[in-house]
Amino acid sequence: MKLAFVFRSTPFGRASTREGLDALLAATAFCDEQDIAVFFLDDGVFSLLNHQDPAQILQKDVVNMFKLLDLYDIEQRYICLESLATAKMTASDCIITCEKMARAALLTLLGKAERVLTF
């Protein structure tokens, strides 16, 4: 994998998640899909929590935009099991499917990326 996008912060309250998703989708224009991986850990798992209503806090719906990963054929998607447990979430709570990995294994895989962008 050449390019890793790491989502570590909550999707609302700041623009980093939206900016990260924009960068990820833009990267698909110049990288092969198999060269891009997406990682969700810490509060970044909330970026995938289904049934959120950001209109209640006057925010744009960034969460549903993650469904575009399927359209763009981004298949290397990983989520931290420990972060899911801390957030009291399960994989069925997520808006898209991701490979669930222990934190240590996820960080080992992340270490193989040529470039890492964190949001």
Swiss-Prot record:
It comes from the Bacteria. Gene3D superfamilies: DsrEFH-like (3.40.1260.10). The keyword Cytoplasm applies. Its main location: cytoplasm. One of its GO terms (cellular component) is cytoplasm. It is found in: Cytoplasm. It holds the Pfam family DsrE. Transmembrane segments: none annotated. Keywords: Cytoplasm. Could be part of a sulfur-relay system. NCBIfam families: PRK00211.1 (NF001238), sulf_tusC_dsrF (TIGR03010). Belongs to the DsrF/TusC family. PANTHER family: PROTEIN TUSC. This is Protein TusC homolog.
